[in-house]
């Protein structure tokens, strides 16, 4: 009989301990985080964000400039190929004005219309002749934060060119490829029917931190260079 009472007493103690443990767990779960803990976590997250965001912005900025420089280099390669394949003139038309988004585009000389037309335009008509910097729908816009320019740099990136300057202006309105009048705020590298540039020249792009140059000589060799925007430190890219 005494043994039964002891066993019952032990079971009661165990049951009370279990109930107490469950109550403790519930109280801990209901308590949540204190205000100090929340503030500490927010402070840590703020510090991490402050460290990470500028780096991410630099990556995006570099990617935009790199991408535009690569694309304008590809446009030059396409223009050179078009000129040789079609036995006509071809050019990369680069708009550097500030009244609208800056852009570049490949044009070809149409021997039927005797005017420049956008490359890839099916069945061009007289109304498609390029005489101004108006957009045609075949442009590649420069990325946000990227523009044509070279800052204060004056040292040439290569002996392909003799000065740091955008290539010569684009011709329009003439009866031959290199006649008419030059379109304001434009820069063109033109290839003749043999695929050679009519003159050495280059395109310069900057984001204010770095400058990219894509230059060509009269033999048709093209190279890309990059430099810090503040001090000339050109190296091949």
Q: Predicted segment positions?
A:
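N-terminal helix-rich module
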Residues: 2-25, 33-36, 47-77, 81, ...
